[in-house]
């Protein structure tokens, strides 16, 4: 039998504890993508699957309230890997804990053909699996949603952080030769990260049309909605500035956490057009999305990293039969151009003009735009189709 171990940082989608313990954004996008991949792998019936998770959370005390992380809710689906959540020591603890778990899994199943998928370019995962792979025969596939050198761009980072990050990247590069194949979110990522020219596939994200929520917009207000990271670097204040020029009777609903929160709260106090709702659970977040008239992502295309990332928020939005308004980033394939609506300027007045033009359309016109958007996503980016690309890449790669 072919056995597959999925090593990631997932947690139950509706976990309330992770919100309770977190002091910043919860990694809902990463969590949703992992569960989409897991669902696709499970339904393929190609492997006997084991799930283990060293949960992706911020370090104690600044970003997370727990020093020792074990689990969040009892789960018969996930083996949680405990780790010590102190800065710097955290990654060392995660490495040894993951290595022990993987070694035991390999020993238990050594009579079978073994595959391991690791989610994210996380050095403790890569090093731990590579060390075990040195001593046994297994196929190692790495999913890379973000390049490590472009992570934490929104945070204010110290010289010490950059020093340790450079060491981390050198260690990671050393062990990448043990990876048999990759999944990247954009083709450009391979050119930057795939230094040993291994096989790869590109999966920018996926949607699950089975996700159902009730709309929170009981009054049928005209809502422009953004849910996600709240950093000036990612264009949120530009969007808020645009609202002062919007003539339509609409409201901008914002959910999330980040460095711009205090400014957003202040602007929401000064304007009844801005409605800040704080940090929400995944289900609460998608309920707000489903209540939107138009969904918006204000992230701009003025940084190098946009070539090496895909805005998963856009694909998440595309589930809801709503128009999606965004900037065309370098990492967005051209096939999306037929269904996404793009800002052509970062100028708040120009942004307001496009927002107004959308909200002046009839409900039927907006519904038709949304229908085409969701139809495209369901047909081309559903979790089964996207996961099949990963499975094909793995199975067509020999050790």
Can you say where each PLM-predicted feature lies in the sequence?
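Conserved acidic donor-binding segment of nucleotide-sugar-dependent glycosyltransferases
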Residues: 339-349, 357-363
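Acidic donor-binding loop of glycosyltransferase active sites
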Residues: 180, 289-307, 322
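A charged, aromatic-enriched C-terminal amphipathic alpha-helix characteristic of glycosyltransferases
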Residues: 44, 363-394
């Amino acid at each position: 039998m072919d056995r597959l171990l999925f090593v990631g940082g997932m947690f139950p989608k509706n976990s309330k504890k992770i919100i309770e313990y977190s002091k910043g954004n919860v990694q809902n996008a990463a969590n949703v993508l992992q569960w989409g991949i897991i669902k696709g792998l499970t339904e393929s019936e190609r492997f006997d699957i084991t799930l283990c998770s060293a949960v992706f959370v911020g370090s104690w005390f600044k970003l997370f309230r727990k020093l020792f992380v074990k689990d969040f809710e009892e789960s018969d689906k996930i083996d949680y890997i405990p780790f010590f959540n102190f800065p710097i020591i955290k990654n060392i603890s995660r490495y040894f804990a993951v290595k022990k778990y993987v070694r035991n899994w390999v020993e238990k199943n050594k009579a079978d053909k073994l595959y391991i998928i690791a989610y994210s370019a996380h050095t403790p995962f890569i090093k731990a699996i590579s060390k075990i792979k040195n001593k046994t025969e297994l196929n190692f596939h790495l999913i890379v949603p973000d390049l490590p050198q472009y992570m934490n761009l929104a945070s204010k980072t110290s010289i010490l952080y950059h020093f340790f990050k450079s060491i981390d990247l050198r260690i990671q590069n050393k062990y990448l030769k043990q990876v048999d194949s990759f999944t990247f979110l954009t083709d450009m990522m391979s050119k930057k990260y795939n230094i040993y020219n291994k096989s790869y596939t590109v999966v920018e994200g996926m949607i699950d049309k089975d996700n159902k929520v009730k709309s929170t917009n009981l009054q049928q207000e005209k809502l422009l909605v953004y849910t996600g990271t709240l950093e000036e670097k990612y264009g949120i204040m530009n969007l808020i500035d645009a609202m002062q020029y919007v003539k339509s009777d609409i409201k901008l609903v914002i959910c999330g956490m980040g460095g711009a929160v205090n400014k957003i709260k202040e602007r929401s106090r000064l304007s009844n057009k801005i409605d800040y709702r704080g940090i929400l659970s995944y289900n609460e977040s998608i309920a707000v999305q489903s209540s939107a008239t138009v969904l918006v992502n204000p992230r701009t295309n003025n940084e190098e990293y946009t070539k090496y990332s895909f805005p998963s928020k856009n694909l998440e939005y595309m589930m809801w039969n709503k128009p999606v308004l965004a900037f065309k980033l370098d990492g967005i394939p051209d096939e999306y151009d037929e269904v996404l609506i793009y800002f052509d300027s970062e100028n708040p007045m120009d942004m307001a003009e496009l927002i107004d033009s959308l909200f002046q359309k009839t409900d039927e016109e907006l519904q038709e735009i949304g229908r085409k958007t969701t139809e495209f996503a369901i047909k081309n980016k559903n979790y089964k189709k996207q996961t099949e690309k990963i499975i094909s890449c793995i199975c067509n790669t020999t050790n």
